[in-house]
Amino acid sequence: MTTIAIFTKNVLLAIAFALFAQGAAIPDPAKRDDNPGFVALDFEVTRKPLDVNATSELSKRSSPSSPLYFEGPSYGIRVSVGSNKQEQQVVLDTGSSDFWVVDSSASCQKGNCKQYGTFDPHSSTSFKSLGSSFRSIGYGDKSSSIGTWGQDTIYLGGTSITNQRFADVTSTSVNQGILGVGRVETESANPPYDNVPITLKKQGKIKTNAYSLYLNSPGAATGTIIFGGVDNAKYSGKLIEEPLVSDRYLAVNLKSLNYNGDNSNAGFGVVVDSGTTISYLPDSIVNDLANKVGAYLEPVGLGNELYFIDCNANPQGSASFTFDNGAKITVPLSEFVLQSTANACVWGLQSSDRQNVPPILGDNFLRHAYAFQLDKETVLSRSGEVHFCLKCFSNLETSIVWKAFFYNRYIQ
């Protein structure tokens, strides 16, 4: 989910973690420190057809207009809250920064907001109310959440953090709680507070405020987020560092877009957001590519138009996104053909001009990028191909590679 003001994420297309090239030895896992400096969590992918009949997720956070809403995949992480470890599944969101859960007595304004777990603050002996009200940053589809701020112990896999600030939501039109891992500048509170990634670092669970996000293949049921590290099985070669171009959101500068040999100069900032299903770029780029693959504009109500494409279309080739420091991310054009609730498929690269939103690179791009370093305000992107191997983790601060014997399934 993304704020519209200046969507940007700290994007690092990373300096290599190639200790092998430097002759460094891999530490023996049996002698592994109890705190390797990273926290690895799997998340579950929930998929729905793209809904083109409502207002947009992209108009969140005070957008001047309401573009169309695309309810695509969401990424659910299991966390536990409180002294009695009350389990929730919350949506992982790189475009927002607050962590909130659904109260056990909450009023659900839309759907069943309690289906993924609830929190009863009265049953946790470690819960402390902070006595102030919470209201989520506004969404263009009119969804919202209200509640109160509190703090408690949060359990993330085998790791826990204490006195973490979060919101206990008592009324919501959102179907699930949210774990926002964006920058503190997009928090709902003023002044800002230490959100989950910052607390993980301050309490010594990770060595740097960074995370790598692996969305896996388009049809996969799971993905992985690693706070404080990267998975070396997910890339070859090096990671290239790209600086953020906003002091508020996770955004980098897109230099050019090449598709099947045709090059379009860009030279503008793009937001990178896991909460946005598709990608949005200016008319000058989108229209040309749409014509080449056979996508066509159709009215969809409320004065909006969208690009659709025949669901049987199988556009060949790829789109390559090049950034300022030379990072190049290649996405197969076939991944831009997305099922929807309409009679045709939605083309996954829409016009930011027509939708009146900033340029955004969503899930169909992020799947091919990799890591975010919030401390250094950069994004890390993988270069080269991904190979089958056991998952090997690198601490982003020390670049020491651990063979993760405790996490031993092969990449699929």
From Swiss-Prot:
The keyword Ubl conjugation does not apply. Belongs to the peptidase A1 family. The gene is SAPP2. Residues 1-25 form the signal peptide. This is Candidapepsin-2. Disulfide bonds join 108-113, 311-345. Glycans are attached at residue 53. GO terms for biological process: proteolysis. It comes from Candida parapsilosis. The active site is at residues 93, 273. The keyword Protease applies. Residues 75-383 form the Peptidase A1 domain. It holds the Pfam family Asp.
